[in-house]
Curated annotation (Swiss-Prot):
Gene3D superfamilies: Classic Zinc Finger. A zinc finger (C2H2-type) spans 66-88, 94-116, 122-144, 150-172, 178-200, 280-303, 317-339. This is Zinc finger protein 787. The modification Phosphoserine is found at residue 132. Residues 39-65 have a biased composition (Pro residues). Pfam families: zf-C2H2, zf-C2H2_6, zf-H2C2_2. GO terms for cellular component: nucleus. Keywords: DNA-binding, Isopeptide bond, Metal-binding, Nucleus, Phosphoprotein, Repeat, Transcription, Transcription regulation, Ubl conjugation, Zinc, Zinc-finger. GO terms for biological process: regulation of transcription by RNA polymerase II. Residues 1-65, 357-382 are annotated as: Disordered. Its main location: nucleus. It comes from Homo sapiens (Human).
Length: 382
């Protein structure tokens, strides 16, 4: 038998040999017996550790060293305390350059200025309609979503706005807070009182009607607000016959009647001098304006697209005298008679009020007709 010497070469390694060869130090290999092999699935599991909170920890509230002496409320900055104290002092240092209205905060002035500039930065994503205030946009979006968060507790009917619910609830209670100071008749809506005031010539003037409406709206909100707003307002009636006191503290609006024999001098100490006349009054909220354009801008911003707009239509016919808008031209022509002739006339036959079709040149014809309305005069020729 012949023996040969051959060079040894490593053969193919199995999986275990490859694992051992991969370690430089054989000591790193852990060899366990069958008894030491852990069972699967494990019998005991430790609870998972809670993940650390995402983001930075909440910042601590800053100290509030500035305290209001009136109510004890504290603030972190002196400027915030100064702004808060204006609610107690009534200071309004921010004035509008266009209408003179004052505000306690500059941000409120910025919002008010949008009435004059026409700026509408808030747009509806559904229809593209724009608004001057975010609150108006929120109310408008309920038209698309169908949301009606204000529900009547009496009948269950829902509304999109709180003021609509307040108007509706008067139908259940029968409350008529808007009272005519001349005859004591009550109305549930301020616009109904405005139409009724045309029957009283001494109350149909723009300036007088504005005071009556504003005082009636304030009195409907509460006696405290009525007294704090303007107190007593004395309105002359006729030529020295007497006055009507509107907004007298401690009295109901129905008790504010004509004071015969008081004279024109009695109106002096009772009247409170206003900074500027505001003959144009919003029939929805009672707010007064010095110009018709301001009233129209207010109504479009706060109460919709203007007076006379039915079903969301844009009023295309605007009165140049007061800024009131109408959808139809015929309604505008009827409205212009108020500015052309002033107070309405009362028919001597039927007692109904009516407006003459022309100005002073038709007074002779009206007197010749005996002060009768066109319906009564027209019936004579039939």
């Amino acid at each position: 038998m012949e023996l040969r010497e051959e060079a040894w070469s490593p053969g193919p390694l199995d999986s275990e040999d490859q694992q051992m060869a991969s370690h430089e130090n054989p000591v790193d290999i852990l060899i366990m017996d069958d008894d030491d092999v852990p069972s699967w699935p494990p019998t005991k599991l430790s609870p998972p550790q809670s993940a650390p909170p995402a983001g930075p920890p909440p910042r601590p509230r800053p100290p509030a060293p500035y305290i209001c002496n009136e109510c004890g409320k504290s603030f972190s900055h002196w400027s915030k305390l100064t702004r808060h104290q204006r609610t107690h002092t009534g200071e309004r240092p921010n004035a509008c350059a266009d209408c003179g209205k004052t505000f306690s905060q500059s941000s409120h002035l910025v919002q008010h200025r949008r009435i004059h500039t026409g700026e509408k930065p808030y747009a509806c994503l559904e229809c593209g309609k724009r608004f001057s205030w975010s609150s108006n946009l929120m109310q408008h979006q309920r038209i698309h979503t169908g949301e009606k968060p204000y529900t009547c507790p009496d009948c269950g009917r829902s509304f999109t706005q709180s003021k609509s619910l307040a108007k509706h609830r008067r139908s259940h209670s029968g409350l008529k807070p808007f009272v005519c100071p001349r005859c004591g008749r009550g109305f549930s809506q301020p616009k109904s009182l405005a139409r009724h005031l045309r029957l009283h010539p001494e109350l149909s003037g723009p300036g007088v009607a504005a005071k009556v409406l504003a005082a009636s709206v304030r009195r409907a909100k509460g006696p405290e607000e009525a007294v704090a707003a303007d107190g007593e307002i004395a309105i002359p009636v006729g030529d020295g016959e007497g006055i009507i006191v509107v907004g007298a503290p401690g009295e109901g609006a129905a008790a504010a009647a004509a004071m015969a024999g008081a004279g024109a001098k009695a109106a002096g100490p009772r009247s409170r001098r206003a900074p500027a006349p505001k003959p144009y009054v919003c029939l929805e909220c009672g707010k007064g304006f010095g110009h018709g354009a301001g009233l129209l801008a207010h109504q479009r911003a706060q109460h919709g697209d203007g007076l006379g707009a039915a079903g969301g239509e844009e009023p295309a016919h605007i009165c140049v005298e007061c800024g009131e808008g109408f959808v139809q031209g015929a309604a505008l022509r009827r409205h212009k008679k108020i500015h052309a002739v002033g107070a309405p006339s009362v028919c001597s036959s039927c007692g109904q009020s009516y407006y003459r079709a022309g100005g002073e040149e038709e007074d002779d014809d009206d007197e010749a007709a005996g002060g009768r309305c066109p319906e009564c005069r027209g019936g004579e020729g039939r």
